[in-house]
Amino acid sequence: MSTNQIILTDQGDNYVNVWSHVAQDLYNHYGETLYNSWFSKVNFIESSLNTVILCAPTNFVRDWIKSKYSMVILQLFQHYNNTIKSIEIITKELPGTTQTVTELPTKTFADIGSSELNSENIFSTLDVRFTFDNFVVGAPNELAYAAARAVAESSGAVSESNPLFLYGGVGLGKTHLMHAIGWYIKQHNPSRKVIYMSAEKFMYQFVKALRNKEVISFKEKFRSVDVLMIDDIQFICGKDSTQEEFFHTFNTLIDNNRQMVISCDRSPSDLDNIEDRIKSRLGWGLVADVHSTTYELRLGILESKIEQMNVKIPKDVIDFLASKIVSNVRELEGALNKVIAHSNFTLKEITLENTQNILRDLLRSNERIITVEDIQKKVASRYNIKLSDMSSSRRLREVARPRQIAMYLSKALTPKSLADIGKKFGKKDHTTVMHAIKKVEELLENDIELREEINLLMKILQN
């Protein structure tokens, strides 16, 4: 039994106690405004056959929590008591003891004073949705995933990837992997001290420590951990004092064989307004790129999410979402949630036509219709070859490689089938296109320069 689980003699009291902790975690994670809007009036009613029954004040609140937060609430309950298998949310109270969690302490992480600097609760900063189990792996993220798992599974020893530097665009899974590392360590090696926070919070805590003359406590907090994870390190660019403190913290941890995990929106070499000595150290370990999603990865993410939410979505709707929402995973999941919520509240069936109407504004603001011809022109220009080379059969490497990249991008950024793509490249068959895509995916596994090049091409085409 995990040391984090709550064991009481009376099972009813146990679940009431667990609900108090779950409510506090919801408050810590989502903040006061959202908590008061959705959770503050939710009651614990009873437990039956390992099912927790909660009561919402209205049908609207019940349906919204079910569609948006039921999986999160269940995972939180299971964190404290793994005998809980499901939750049920009703609107009519049942006889028996109820507990409403309405007034919670308003103290959040940002309010922690110096006397509490060393009592950091990593659980309050981790998102229960972000674990290795629900991270969908594909060619764009498999190196980063494997490295993150290696760090998490190192069982107290420092992994070979130290520091682990994850970089890529917004919403592609970097933060998910960092949270997953934290959860895995907490569950399998809870004695290890782990801190996860954004670079922005690191800076604010440092400034607060300077103002309150408590820098020693600040240093002790961050330099005594086993694993330090800093998200969005680009935030400290141009902030000299914070960079200086981060530099010494980095050196202390690395010198003492402590693990560091850092995320950024660009590679270390592309960071501006940051000291060269920091830039150099960020690249000491493993630098793993999380690059833009492919159609197949987006499809896998949607199918995984749909299975978790236990809903039925027509295949043409799933294909439509995977083809049209190409910018990042966060936006893809947001679009899916919007479609499901609309169906729940209007009681309308999920169809392709309804989905197109629901997401009309999102698609209009986001969509830059990319054609195979657009891709061919951009890649040909980038590699200084003739546009006609895209449809030729020339096998010279300086022509064949850009053509393969253009085929790869055509599959990633357009809804075209392999056969349709082949027609645009001199009437080549689908097996030729498939071979080109696989060849590029193999190269992406080890060629950091090529990954950056393709990421750049994707951004240019999408914008």
Swiss-Prot record:
User: Where does the record place a coiled coil?
Assistant: none
Q: Which domain of life is it from?
A: Bacteria
Q: How does it assemble?
A: Oligomerizes as a right-handed, spiral filament on DNA at oriC.
Q: Look up the signal peptide feature and give its range.
A: none
- Keyword Chloroplast among record annotations: no
Which positions are annotated as binding ATP? G171, G173, K174, T175
Biological process terms from the Gene Ontology for this record are: DNA replication initiation; regulation of DNA replication
Q: Where does the protein end up? A: Cytoplasm
What job does this protein perform? Plays an essential role in the initiation and regulation of chromosomal replication. ATP-DnaA binds to the origin of replication (oriC) to initiate formation of the DNA replication initiation complex once per cell cycle. Binds the DnaA box (a 9 base pair repeat at the origin) and separates the double-stranded (ds)DNA. Forms a right-handed helical filament on oriC DNA; dsDNA binds to the exterior of the filament while single-stranded (ss)DNA is stabiized in the filament's interior.
For the region Domain I, interacts with DnaA modulators, what residue ranges are annotated? 1-83
Name this protein carries in UniProt: Chromosomal replication initiator protein DnaA
Q: Which UniProt keywords apply?
A: ATP-binding, Cytoplasm, DNA replication, DNA-binding, Lipid-binding, Nucleotide-binding
GO terms for cellular component: cytoplasm; plasma membrane
Name the family. Belongs to the DnaA family.
